[in-house]
Protein backbone atom coordinates (compact mmCIF):
# COMPACT_ATOMS: atom_id res chain seq x y z
CA UNK A 1 0.00 0.00 0.00
CA UNK A 2 1.19 3.49 -0.89
CA UNK A 3 -0.11 6.94 0.03
CA UNK A 4 -0.32 10.16 -1.94
CA UNK A 5 -1.09 13.55 -0.39
CA UNK A 6 -4.16 14.83 -2.24
CA UNK A 7 -6.05 18.00 -1.28
CA UNK A 8 -4.62 17.86 2.27
CA UNK A 9 -5.59 14.19 2.65
CA UNK A 10 -3.35 11.11 2.59
CA UNK A 11 -5.00 8.88 -0.01
CA UNK A 12 -4.04 5.21 0.28
CA UNK A 13 -3.79 3.16 -2.89
CA UNK A 14 -2.59 -0.08 -4.44
CA UNK A 15 -0.07 0.14 -7.27
CA UNK A 16 0.57 -3.12 -9.14
CA UNK A 17 2.08 -4.04 -12.50
CA UNK A 18 3.69 -2.16 -15.36
CA UNK A 19 2.32 -0.68 -18.55
CA UNK A 20 -0.55 1.62 -19.44
CA UNK A 21 -2.11 3.05 -16.26
CA UNK A 22 -5.55 1.89 -15.15
CA UNK A 23 -7.10 3.74 -12.19
CA UNK A 24 -10.00 1.97 -10.43
CA UNK A 25 -12.50 3.91 -8.27
CA UNK A 26 -14.53 1.80 -5.83
CA UNK A 27 -18.17 2.15 -4.82
CA UNK A 28 -20.16 2.54 -1.60
CA UNK A 29 -18.97 0.62 1.47
CA UNK A 30 -15.90 -0.48 -0.50
CA UNK A 31 -12.23 0.51 -0.71
CA UNK A 32 -9.20 -0.59 -2.72
CA UNK A 33 -9.78 -4.17 -1.54
CA UNK A 34 -12.92 -4.32 -3.71
CA UNK A 35 -10.73 -5.02 -6.74
CA UNK A 36 -8.92 -8.06 -5.31
CA UNK A 37 -10.62 -10.51 -7.67
CA UNK A 38 -9.47 -8.68 -10.81
CA UNK A 39 -6.03 -7.47 -9.70
CA UNK A 40 -4.25 -10.26 -11.56
CA UNK A 41 -5.89 -9.93 -14.99
CA UNK A 42 -6.01 -6.13 -14.97
CA UNK A 43 -2.35 -5.77 -13.92
CA UNK A 44 -0.88 -8.53 -16.12
CA UNK A 45 0.00 -6.05 -18.88
CA UNK A 46 -0.99 -2.77 -17.26
CA UNK A 47 -0.17 -0.66 -14.24
CA UNK A 48 -3.19 -0.96 -11.96
CA UNK A 49 -3.74 1.80 -9.42
CA UNK A 50 -6.66 1.48 -6.99
CA UNK A 51 -7.16 4.25 -4.40
CA UNK A 52 -9.40 4.29 -1.37
CA UNK A 53 -11.42 7.49 -1.48
CA UNK A 54 -11.45 10.02 1.35
CA UNK A 55 -12.70 8.57 4.70
CA UNK A 56 -12.81 4.97 3.46
CA UNK A 57 -10.55 2.19 4.82
CA UNK A 58 -7.69 2.24 5.83
CA UNK A 59 -9.05 5.28 7.65
CA UNK A 60 -11.43 4.22 10.42
CA UNK A 61 -13.93 7.06 10.19
CA UNK A 62 -16.87 7.49 12.55
CA UNK A 63 -19.03 9.43 10.09
CA UNK A 64 -18.56 12.77 11.83
CA UNK A 65 -16.63 15.81 10.66
CA UNK A 66 -14.36 15.47 7.67
CA UNK A 67 -15.25 16.27 4.08
CA UNK A 68 -17.45 13.49 2.75
CA UNK A 69 -19.06 15.16 -0.24
CA UNK A 70 -19.45 13.98 -3.80
CA UNK A 71 -17.81 17.13 -5.16
CA UNK A 72 -14.88 16.60 -2.79
CA UNK A 73 -14.40 13.04 -4.00
CA UNK A 74 -14.56 14.19 -7.63
CA UNK A 75 -11.94 16.85 -6.89
CA UNK A 76 -9.84 14.23 -5.07
CA UNK A 77 -10.00 11.83 -8.01
CA UNK A 78 -8.94 14.58 -10.42
CA UNK A 79 -6.07 15.68 -8.18
CA UNK A 80 -5.00 12.07 -7.61
CA UNK A 81 -4.73 11.40 -11.35
CA UNK A 82 -2.91 14.70 -11.88
CA UNK A 83 -0.47 14.06 -9.04
CA UNK A 84 0.37 10.58 -10.31
CA UNK A 85 1.97 12.40 -13.23
CA UNK A 86 1.32 9.58 -15.69
CA UNK A 87 -0.60 11.53 -18.29
CA UNK A 88 -4.05 10.33 -19.42
CA UNK A 89 -5.21 7.12 -17.71
CA UNK A 90 -7.85 4.48 -18.32
CA UNK A 91 -10.42 5.08 -15.59
CA UNK A 92 -12.71 2.35 -14.24
CA UNK A 93 -15.46 3.25 -11.78
CA UNK A 94 -18.05 1.03 -10.11
CA UNK A 95 -21.37 2.18 -8.64
CA UNK A 96 -20.70 5.35 -6.60
CA UNK A 97 -17.20 5.26 -8.05
CA UNK A 98 -18.82 5.15 -11.47
CA UNK A 99 -20.56 8.42 -10.68
CA UNK A 100 -17.24 9.95 -9.61
CA UNK A 101 -15.58 8.66 -12.78
CA UNK A 102 -18.42 9.98 -14.97
CA UNK A 103 -17.97 13.46 -13.49
CA UNK A 104 -14.18 13.28 -13.92
CA UNK A 105 -14.77 12.39 -17.57
CA UNK A 106 -17.02 15.44 -17.94
CA UNK A 107 -14.82 17.91 -16.09
CA UNK A 108 -11.38 16.71 -17.18
CA UNK A 109 -11.54 14.62 -20.34
CA UNK A 110 -7.89 15.49 -20.92
CA UNK A 111 -7.01 13.15 -18.04
CA UNK A 112 -8.86 10.17 -19.53
CA UNK A 113 -7.82 7.82 -22.32
CA UNK A 114 -10.84 5.54 -21.96
CA UNK A 115 -13.61 5.26 -19.40
CA UNK A 116 -15.28 2.14 -18.01
CA UNK A 117 -18.46 2.73 -15.99
CA UNK A 118 -19.73 -0.36 -14.19
CA UNK A 119 -23.35 0.40 -13.29
CA UNK A 120 -22.67 4.01 -12.25
CA UNK A 121 -24.75 5.06 -9.27
CA UNK A 122 -27.07 8.02 -9.10
CA UNK A 123 -30.44 9.25 -10.25
CA UNK A 124 -31.72 10.71 -13.51
CA UNK A 125 -33.14 14.10 -14.38
CA UNK A 126 -36.63 13.95 -15.85
CA UNK A 127 -35.24 14.39 -19.36
CA UNK A 128 -33.50 10.99 -19.05
CA UNK A 129 -36.03 9.04 -16.97
CA UNK A 130 -38.33 6.75 -18.99
CA UNK A 131 -41.97 7.43 -18.15
CA UNK A 132 -42.79 3.81 -17.36
CA UNK A 133 -40.08 3.70 -14.68
CA UNK A 134 -40.91 6.90 -12.83
CA UNK A 135 -41.79 5.11 -9.55
CA UNK A 136 -38.29 3.95 -8.60
CA UNK A 137 -37.52 6.71 -6.09
CA UNK A 138 -37.74 4.20 -3.23
CA UNK A 139 -36.03 1.24 -4.90
CA UNK A 140 -32.55 -0.23 -5.08
CA UNK A 141 -29.90 2.36 -5.79
CA UNK A 142 -32.11 5.30 -4.76
CA UNK A 143 -31.32 7.85 -2.08
CA UNK A 144 -34.21 6.46 -0.01
CA UNK A 145 -32.54 3.03 -0.09
CA UNK A 146 -29.29 4.53 1.24
CA UNK A 147 -31.19 6.50 3.89
CA UNK A 148 -33.07 3.46 5.22
CA UNK A 149 -29.83 1.54 5.58
CA UNK A 150 -27.90 4.41 7.16
CA UNK A 151 -30.65 5.03 9.73
CA UNK A 152 -30.24 1.49 11.04
CA UNK A 153 -26.47 1.94 11.27
CA UNK A 154 -26.91 5.26 13.10
CA UNK A 155 -29.27 3.54 15.55
CA UNK A 156 -26.58 0.99 16.42
CA UNK A 157 -27.75 -1.87 14.21
CA UNK A 158 -24.60 -2.09 12.10
CA UNK A 159 -25.24 -5.51 10.60
CA UNK A 160 -28.92 -4.76 10.02
CA UNK A 161 -28.07 -1.60 8.11
CA UNK A 162 -25.44 -3.31 5.99
CA UNK A 163 -27.76 -6.24 5.33
CA UNK A 164 -30.53 -3.85 4.22
CA UNK A 165 -28.15 -2.07 1.85
CA UNK A 166 -26.63 -5.19 0.28
CA UNK A 167 -29.93 -7.10 0.03
CA UNK A 168 -31.60 -4.00 -1.41
CA UNK A 169 -29.06 -3.89 -4.23
CA UNK A 170 -28.46 -7.57 -4.95
CA UNK A 171 -31.65 -9.22 -3.66
CA UNK A 172 -32.76 -10.96 -0.45
CA UNK A 173 -30.13 -13.21 1.10
CA UNK A 174 -27.19 -11.48 -0.61
CA UNK A 175 -25.61 -10.37 2.67
CA UNK A 176 -25.55 -13.95 3.92
CA UNK A 177 -23.78 -15.08 0.74
CA UNK A 178 -20.89 -12.63 1.16
CA UNK A 179 -17.53 -14.01 2.21
CA UNK A 180 -16.26 -13.01 5.64
CA UNK A 181 -13.68 -10.78 3.95
CA UNK A 182 -16.38 -8.99 1.94
CA UNK A 183 -18.48 -8.49 5.06
CA UNK A 184 -15.47 -7.11 6.91
CA UNK A 185 -14.82 -4.59 4.15
CA UNK A 186 -18.40 -3.32 4.45
CA UNK A 187 -18.14 -3.16 8.23
CA UNK A 188 -14.87 -1.22 7.98
CA UNK A 189 -16.63 1.39 5.81
CA UNK A 190 -20.10 1.32 7.37
CA UNK A 191 -20.09 4.85 8.74
CA UNK A 192 -19.42 6.39 5.34
CA UNK A 193 -23.03 5.52 4.56
CA UNK A 194 -24.20 8.02 7.20
CA UNK A 195 -22.60 10.87 5.27
CA UNK A 196 -23.57 9.52 1.87
CA UNK A 197 -27.24 10.37 2.48
CA UNK A 198 -26.40 14.09 2.21
CA UNK A 199 -23.34 14.07 -0.03
CA UNK A 200 -24.79 16.41 -2.65
CA UNK A 201 -24.81 13.99 -5.57
CA UNK A 202 -26.32 15.61 -8.65
CA UNK A 203 -28.69 13.69 -10.93
CA UNK A 204 -27.49 12.83 -14.41
CA UNK A 205 -28.96 14.99 -17.15
CA UNK A 206 -29.28 14.44 -20.87
CA UNK A 207 -26.82 17.29 -21.40
CA UNK A 208 -24.33 15.54 -19.10
CA UNK A 209 -24.54 12.31 -21.06
CA UNK A 210 -24.24 14.06 -24.41
CA UNK A 211 -21.15 15.95 -23.21
CA UNK A 212 -19.23 12.83 -22.12
CA UNK A 213 -16.45 12.82 -24.71
CA UNK A 214 -14.02 10.00 -23.73
CA UNK A 215 -14.65 6.58 -25.32
CA UNK A 216 -16.79 4.86 -22.70
CA UNK A 217 -17.72 1.26 -21.98
CA UNK A 218 -20.81 0.82 -19.80
CA UNK A 219 -20.79 -2.54 -18.01
CA UNK A 220 -23.87 -4.02 -16.34
CA UNK A 221 -24.85 -7.20 -14.59
CA UNK A 222 -27.62 -9.15 -16.31
CA UNK A 223 -29.35 -9.82 -12.97
CA UNK A 224 -29.26 -6.27 -11.56
CA UNK A 225 -32.68 -4.81 -10.75
CA UNK A 226 -33.99 -1.40 -9.72
CA UNK A 227 -32.69 1.96 -10.84
CA UNK A 228 -29.11 1.00 -11.71
CA UNK A 229 -29.73 -0.70 -15.09
CA UNK A 230 -32.11 2.10 -16.06
CA UNK A 231 -29.39 4.67 -15.37
CA UNK A 232 -26.89 2.62 -17.37
CA UNK A 233 -29.16 2.33 -20.41
CA UNK A 234 -30.11 6.02 -20.32
CA UNK A 235 -26.53 7.25 -20.14
CA UNK A 236 -25.27 4.79 -22.76
CA UNK A 237 -28.04 5.83 -25.15
CA UNK A 238 -26.92 9.47 -25.14
CA UNK A 239 -23.15 9.38 -24.59
CA UNK A 240 -21.58 9.98 -28.03
CA UNK A 241 -18.75 7.41 -27.82
CA UNK A 242 -20.42 4.68 -25.79
CA UNK A 243 -20.51 0.90 -25.90
CA UNK A 244 -22.36 -1.45 -23.57
CA UNK A 245 -21.49 -4.91 -22.26
CA UNK A 246 -23.76 -7.01 -20.03
CA UNK A 247 -22.18 -9.71 -17.85
CA UNK A 248 -24.32 -12.90 -17.64
CA UNK A 249 -25.02 -14.56 -14.30
CA UNK A 250 -24.03 -11.44 -12.37
CA UNK A 251 -25.65 -8.56 -10.56
CA UNK A 252 -24.36 -5.20 -9.39
CA UNK A 253 -21.04 -6.64 -8.15
CA UNK A 254 -20.34 -8.13 -11.57
CA UNK A 255 -16.56 -7.77 -11.40
CA UNK A 256 -16.50 -9.81 -8.19
CA UNK A 257 -19.17 -12.31 -9.20
CA UNK A 258 -17.78 -12.93 -12.69
CA UNK A 259 -14.22 -11.53 -12.69
CA UNK A 260 -13.07 -13.39 -15.79
CA UNK A 261 -16.07 -12.28 -17.85
CA UNK A 262 -15.64 -8.71 -16.62
CA UNK A 263 -11.98 -8.60 -17.64
CA UNK A 264 -12.79 -10.29 -20.96
CA UNK A 265 -14.92 -7.29 -21.97
CA UNK A 266 -12.90 -4.52 -20.29
CA UNK A 267 -9.35 -5.40 -21.38
CA UNK A 268 -10.04 -5.62 -25.15
CA UNK A 269 -11.89 -2.29 -24.96
CA UNK A 270 -8.94 -0.62 -23.22
CA UNK A 271 -6.44 -2.15 -25.64
CA UNK A 272 -8.13 -0.89 -28.81
Feature map (PLM): residue ranges:
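Conserved HGGG/HGGXW glycine-rich cap/lid loop of the alpha/beta-hydrolase fold
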Residues: 9-66, 80
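Conserved acidic catalytic loop of the alpha/beta-hydrolase fold
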Residues: 71-89
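Gly/Ala-rich beta-loop-alpha elbow adjacent to hydrolase catalytic centers
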Residues: 93, 97, 101
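Flexible "cap/lid" loop of the alpha/beta hydrolase fold
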Residues: 102, 106, 113-153
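Conserved alpha/beta-hydrolase catalytic His-Asp/Glu region
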Residues: 153-194
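Conserved serine/cysteine hydrolase catalytic core
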Residues: 181-237
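Catalytic histidine neighborhood in serine/cysteine hydrolases
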Residues: 236-252
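Catalytic histidine-centered segment of alpha/beta-hydrolase-like enzymes
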Residues: 250-263
Amino acid sequence: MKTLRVNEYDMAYLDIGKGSPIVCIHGSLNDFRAWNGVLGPLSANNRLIAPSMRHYFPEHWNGEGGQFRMDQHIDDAIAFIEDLGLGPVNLIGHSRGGHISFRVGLERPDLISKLVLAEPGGTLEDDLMPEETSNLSEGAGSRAHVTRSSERIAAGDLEGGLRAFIDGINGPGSWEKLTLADRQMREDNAYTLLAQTNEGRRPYSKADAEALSPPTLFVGGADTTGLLPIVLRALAAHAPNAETAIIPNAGHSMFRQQPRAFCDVVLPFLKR
